[in-house]
Amino acid sequence: MFEERIVLDSAEFNLRHLTDSADDRQRIATFSAGKNALGLERYLKDCSVGHELAGENRTYLVLDAITDELACYFTLRSGLIPVPENSGQGYLSTLSGMELAYFALNENYRRRKTKTTNTRIGFYVFDKFILPIAKHVSRIIGARILFVYALPHPKLMSYYANTLGFRTLPRELEKFLYDRVKPDSDEGCVFMFQPL
């Protein structure tokens, strides 16, 4: 038997599901992802609740445990990744996974917080919240990978690879995947993954 719920709060941050509290509307309204991540900000403010209610994904808010400020958010959803079989007959197989669909820091919070602490917020949230949820869900439903469609910015891709442990596919497999399942909203992004 498995635990239906896992508790992931820490001394520094509390995790809350997007629709848990009406108070979160004000927190979301003041969220700023910064000038290079306006799409992530717009998603949280304009689309996340609708997608949540439609059952398309789950969005989580990460709140500072002391000040209750919104530090960041992330969105997870399940997915299947097509992979070619080696039979040479054009058959496809699939690999089950979880997509880290959205992940953004509140830039206002980050600027203030990094002046007073050495905590790397993104890594901390990934390590203490995102990975444990993905692994928990994997044990329940059988997901094999955690994947992301990363913007093709060298600094961001390096962060995903060197800090968070994601890998890229060989170019021909990336093209294969792109031709079949990459969403239009991820146009130009690079598929990255890690085993669960």
Predicted regions and their residues:
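Short loop/turn motifs enriched for small/polar and acidic residues
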Residues: 149-153
